[in-house]
């Protein structure tokens, strides 16, 4: 049944958020201290940082690696501390990576190696990482071009696939107290065949917001991410803007991933002693008006996600975190409670107190750097749970949970820069779903957690090798079993966008139920860094999907080559 929209509440929330933000910005000069913008999310970049923490054999006091992105200042401080104490940068490749991290955030390292030997036309690229830069006591500015030009062949398409992205990245500081970041990119792309096929069922471009059709089978979309950043005190950092968040130490996240599009957020992070506490409020799209021809005109219905995560370092090797997240309706005044805006409270208690029907997820995560070169990690997400129903073994539909376990093994068999990661993910049917678009765990019709949604098992293996300082080789693969719906009216619990009140049965639900879909995905990539942050990539992708549903019974091979400049690799790994 369609809910009557009452935008008063959404306007009220926006009103108070704006007043809070204006107050903070107006007041910050009274107490703000030096701060730092983030290093953009990039699995290759972040792997180096995680690698050195594992190699050191103890947790990084400067970083709580479960919360991503990391701040540039913290990255440099941690890298410098390792260079002085642990000698973890022992190989040529590790020493290159250390210098890369310092050069990429030279405003914090002041590394002599960040200077270009021959600036372009005297004024450009005085620093290896920046086209233009301003380095004054009251103003710091970094401007870099962004390019992603890729061309490939998909075995199921006659025409080539490609990506053509042009953009700019800007970051800086004002008075060393307030930071700012902006990324803008214009894209035209012909997507892989299996991604194009998915648009028929869910007409949104993975990772993106508004899009339109380009030529016969392409897509055109604009990317924009931006935020302001400042430290309220030495230990409290705040950010406001539009970007992504990743929670976890795995390749996937079952809590908060970077798969969905960026969203408007207000974030407060407290890091003190051995404790890190994050509160974040996100505004996301509950649904969109889209067809295979592109996104329709808004405005779209809005919902909010209030999220907090607390973690503590126990000893020098073990980190334990607890989280709670509530998805609530911003277009109805019937069941919103302003207590959701309280950054230090248990949302489940609010539900019990006021009888709320909002969707609350709770759970835990951990990381254990057991010995040098070996780390274990995991996540547990509880969407709904009744112990007696679990004990009965009757497959009650509302026993909704997700589990992740993994390990990272650094310098495998004593071979420098050969790293292995293994991971398993299990998600029960109907997890992340709700009886309303305003309660499911999604943004712009895309999962906020795992890209496969729910009702699946998955195994992942990743091997990374850096035989030469500028050469990175990655072999990545996953095998997943997911239960699909036989038709649009059926609901086996794998599509988190479907109303879970339309479930096929209250009992007898098992992981992978419905029409079974087996996916084998292999990605072999070699990347060579020609200049700082300028890469040439060669890639081979093999994807085999077996199902009784013809649309999902496909075999795809893709070969491609790309030039990347100041941007992470783009993937459709599902």
What are these regions (language model features)?
Residues 1-37:
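Bacterial Sec-dependent N-terminal signal peptides
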Residues 31-32, 239-244, 522-524:
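An exposure/low-complexity boundary signal
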Residues 36-53:
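Short N-terminal segments immediately surrounding and downstream of signal-peptide cleavage
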Residues 43, 58-66, 71-73, 78-319, ...:
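Outer-membrane beta-barrel channel domains
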Residues 49, 236-243, 381, 537:
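Active-site-adjacent bridging/hinge elements
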Residues 221, 313, 318-574:
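Exposed, low-structure sequence patches enriched in small/polar residues
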């Amino acid at each position: 049944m369609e809910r009557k929209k009452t935008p008063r509440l959404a306007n009220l929330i926006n009103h108070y958020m704006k007043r809070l933000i204006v107050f903070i910005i107006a007041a910050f000069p009274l107490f703000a201290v030096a701060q730092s913008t983030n290093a953009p999310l990039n699995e290759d970049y972040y792997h180096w940082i995680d690698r050195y923490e594992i190699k050191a054999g103890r947790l990084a006091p400067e970083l709580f690696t479960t919360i991503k992105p990391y701040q540039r200042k913290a990255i440099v401080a941690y890298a410098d501390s390792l260079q002085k104490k642990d000698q973890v940068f022992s190989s040529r490749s590790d020493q290159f990576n250390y210098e890369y991290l310092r050069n990429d955030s030279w405003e914090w390292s002041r590394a002599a190696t960040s200077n270009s030997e021959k600036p372009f036309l005297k004024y450009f690229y005085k620093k290896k990482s920046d086209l233009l830069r301003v380095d004054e006591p009251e103003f710091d500015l970094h401007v870099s071009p962004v390019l992603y030009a890729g061309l490939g062949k998909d075995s199921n398409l006659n025409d080539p696939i490609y990506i053509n992205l042009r953009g700019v990245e800007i970051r800086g500081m004002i008075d060393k107290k307030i930071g700012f970041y902006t990324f803008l990119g214009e894209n035209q792309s012909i997507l892989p065949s299996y991604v194009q096929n998915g648009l028929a069922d869910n007409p949104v471009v993975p990772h993106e917001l508004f899009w339109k059709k380009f030529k016969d089978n392409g897509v055109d979309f604009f990317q924009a991410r931006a935020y302001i950043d400042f430290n309220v005190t030495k230990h409290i950092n705040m950010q406001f803007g539009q970007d992504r968040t990743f929670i976890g130490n795995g390749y996937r996240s079952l809590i908060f991933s970077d798969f969905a599009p960026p969203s408007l957020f207000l974030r407060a992070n407290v890091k003190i002693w051995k404790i890190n506490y994050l509160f974040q409020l996100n505004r996301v799209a509950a649904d969109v008006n889209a067809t295979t021809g592109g996104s329709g005109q808004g405005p779209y219905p809005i919902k909010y996600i209030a999220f907090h995560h607390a973690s503590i370092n126990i000893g020098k090797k073990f980190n334990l975190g607890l989280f709670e997240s509530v998805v609530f309706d911003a277009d109805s005044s019937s069941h919103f409670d302003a207590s959701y805006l309280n950054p230090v409270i248990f949302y489940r208690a609010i539900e019990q107190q006021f009888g709320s029907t909002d969707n609350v997820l709770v759970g835990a995560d951990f990381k254990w750097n057991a010995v040098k070169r070996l780390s274990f990690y995991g996540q547990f997400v509880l969407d709904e749970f009744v112990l007696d129903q679990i004990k009965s073994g009757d497959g009650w539909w509302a026993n909704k949970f997700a589990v992740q376990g993994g390990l990272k093994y650094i310098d495998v068999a004593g071979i420098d820069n050969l790293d292995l990661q293994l991971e398993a993910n299990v998600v029960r049917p109907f997890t992340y779903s709700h009886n309303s678009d305003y309660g499911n765990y999604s943004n712009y019709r895309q999962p906020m957690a795992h890209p496969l949604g729910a009702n699946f098992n998955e195994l992942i293996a990743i091997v990374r090798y850096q035989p030469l300082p500028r050469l990175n080789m990655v072999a990545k693969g996953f095998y997943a079993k997911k239960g699909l719906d036989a038709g649009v009216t059926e609901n086996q619990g794998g599509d988190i966008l479907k109303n879970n009140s339309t479930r096929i049965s209250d009992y007898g639900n098992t992981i992978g139920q419905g029409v079974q879909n087996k996916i084998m995905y292999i990605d072999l990539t070699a990347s060579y860094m020609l200049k700082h942050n300028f890469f040439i990539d060669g890639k081979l992708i093999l994807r085999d999907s077996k199902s009784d549903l013809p649309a999902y019974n496909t075999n795809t091979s893709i070969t491609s080559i790309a030039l990347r400049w100041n941007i992470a690799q783009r993937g459709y790994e599902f």
